[in-house]
């Protein structure tokens, strides 16, 4: 009888997130039952499932929160090499920009998202909209242009196409990530004017025109302050000035401190979080439950959007 009663209680708990999705329970009431450990768990990346090779997030099975798997782009869907699945190699971003045709790019985004969904994935880590600052950048082919207007318009079209299929687009790498050499440790020194008119402008256009569900912060520092720990960038500019309502993830395996990223409004640390460090920060009074709740809410809101 004791085992049956416990199992019944667990089944009731697992149904709770479904109740939120179906309108029988508020997200506030759902989150009120989560422990600090549960919230911290939501703020770190989760192991690969299925064909994914870029990890995921969510994954609170006792509460019915699913694992939401990601897949890399941008020139087509990249999945685990161990899977015997074929995917489409779409033209790279630079070539798509050469069409000067946002409607066509939107169609590519839609078709790509359909393929993402067919493979039981939910977040496509594209578009990449960094600026062609130097022709020697090793990932220029992933970026649209040296012109932030073209990058923004093409990126917005891609996001609209992807999200029309209820798949989340992840706009990256925010911001001033314009080289590959030593990018986990580099510091992009840039004036306020150049930052806003060149390196942020494409992201601003995408946020205002396409409302992306996720944005990926970059490894690099900007004027001495790591992008993933930069509250001015993530809260004041991205959310405050531009009106971004979605979730922010780090780039994979950042060297930044997890609790500082949470304080800055960087919601999920990918590929995995550092829960013990976050707990230690809470014990030392450097981080509070309200900050965990702000980030976890955005994670759960994103999961509710995905079909």
Language-model features: where?
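Single conserved hydrophobic/aromatic residue that forms the stacking wall/gate
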Residues: 2-9, 13
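Second-shell residues forming the walls of enzyme active-site clefts
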Residues: 144-294, 298-301
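Long, structured ligand/cofactor-binding scaffold of large enzymes
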Residues: 38-188
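Sec-exported extracytoplasmic/periplasmic mature domains
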Residues: 32, 36-39, 44-51, 113-121, ...
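A structural signal for short hydrophobic/aromatic patches embedded in well-ordered alpha helices
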Residues: 27-30, 42-43, 108, 295
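Short acidic-aromatic active-site loops that bind/stabilize oxyanions
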Residues: 2, 32, 98-109, 192, ...
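Second-shell loop/turn segments in exported
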Residues: 15-30, 54, 93-103, 140-148, ...
């Amino acid at each position: 009888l004791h085992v049956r009663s416990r199992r019944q209680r667990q089944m009731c708990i697992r149904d709770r997130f479904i109740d939120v999705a179906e309108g029988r329970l508020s997200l506030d009431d759902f989150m009120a039952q989560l422990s600090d450990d549960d919230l911290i768990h939501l703020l770190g990346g989760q192991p690969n499932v299925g064909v994914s090779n870029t990890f995921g997030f969510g994954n609170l099975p006792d509460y019915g929160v699913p694992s939401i798997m990601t897949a890399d782009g941008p020139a087509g869907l990249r999945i685990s090499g161990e899977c015997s699945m074929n995917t489409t190699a779409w033209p790279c971003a630079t070539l798509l920009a050469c069409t000067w045709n946002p409607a066509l790019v939107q169609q590519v985004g839609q078709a790509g998202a359909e393929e993402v969904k067919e493979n039981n994935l939910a977040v496509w880590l594209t578009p990449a909209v960094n600026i062609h600052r130097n022709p020697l950048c090793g990932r220029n082919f992933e970026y649209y242009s040296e012109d932030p207007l073209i990058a923004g318009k093409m990126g917005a079209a891609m996001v609209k196409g992807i999200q029309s299929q209820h798949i989340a687009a992840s706009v990256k790498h925010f911001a001033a990530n314009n080289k590959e050499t030593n990018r986990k440790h580099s510091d992009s020194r840039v004036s306020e004017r150049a930052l806003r008119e060149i390196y942020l402008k494409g992201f601003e256009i995408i946020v205002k025109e396409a409302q992306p569900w996720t944005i990926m912060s970059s490894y690099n520092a900007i004027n001495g302050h790591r992008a993933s720990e930069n509250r001015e960038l993530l809260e004041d500019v991205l959310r405050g000035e531009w009106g971004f309502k979605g979730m922010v993830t780090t780039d994979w395996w950042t060297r930044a401190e997890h609790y500082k990223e949470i304080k800055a409004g960087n919601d999920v640390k990918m590929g995995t979080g550092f829960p013990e460090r976050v707990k230690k920060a809470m014990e030392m009074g450097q981080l509070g439950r309200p900050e965990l709740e702000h980030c976890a809410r955005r994670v759960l809101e994103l999961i509710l959007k995905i079909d």
